[in-house]
């Protein structure tokens, strides 16, 4: 939505039709009227695609066409359910299977993102917001580590890493458990910023 407000072309994939409908409503009712001036020929330009954002089939023959990817994939181990579609990452309970699909998605994003140029200060980022989960005696599983390794494997460069502090309303309820189990509260998510260099 922020991209549309800045008059950028927006392409969105989601397997949840309701999400796409909500975005479309916001773009049509709030962004487009603000951006469309009587003297301007620039209108909001967007394409919302009700399909798998891993495969991105519509763009399977394309390359070097995207200036920026913003991506918020589901947590690992089917922590939250968004659809019943088996292609949806939220439905993959197997950790290895989940990351195999993430690798497919990242390869597609690498193919589609434009090339960055460090010397000239041209950055065409792939921004992925990821989280972590505590799994009892299996410990803390952080998605950023695994996704950084996938990025390195497929030839993406980790340009930056941003830690976002969360302020969950239920935070006070987990303080006791945190003390008893001797771990800190999970109050952060991570943004990984990848780029593709020649």
What do these predicted ranges mean?
Residues 1-198:
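Class I S-adenosyl-L-methionine-dependent methyltransferase catalytic core
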């Amino acid at each position: 939505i922020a991209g549309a407000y800045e008059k950028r072309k927006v392409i969105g994939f989601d397997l949840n039709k309701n999400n796409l409908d909500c975005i479309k409503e916001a773009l049509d009712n709030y962004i487009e009227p603000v951006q469309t001036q009587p003297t301007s020929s620039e209108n909001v330009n967007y394409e919302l695609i009700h399909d798998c954002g891993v495969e991105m089939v519509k763009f399977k023959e394309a390359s070097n066409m995207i200036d920026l990817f913003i991506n918020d994939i589901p947590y690992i181990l089917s922590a939250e359910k968004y659809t019943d579609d088996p292609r949806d990452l939220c439905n993959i309970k197997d950790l290895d299977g989940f990351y195999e699909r993430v690798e497919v998605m990242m390869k597609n994003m690498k193919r589609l993102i434009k090339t960055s140029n460090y010397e000239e200060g041209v950055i065409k980022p792939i921004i992925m917001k990821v989280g972590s989960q505590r799994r009892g005696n299996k410990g803390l599983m952080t998605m950023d580590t695994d996704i950084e390794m996938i990025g390195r494997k497929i030839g993406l460069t980790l340009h930056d890493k941003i830690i976002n502090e969360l302020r969950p309303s239920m935070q006070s309820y987990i303080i006791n458990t945190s003390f008893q189990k001797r771990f800190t509260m999970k109050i952060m998510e991570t943004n990984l910023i990848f780029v593709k260099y020649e």
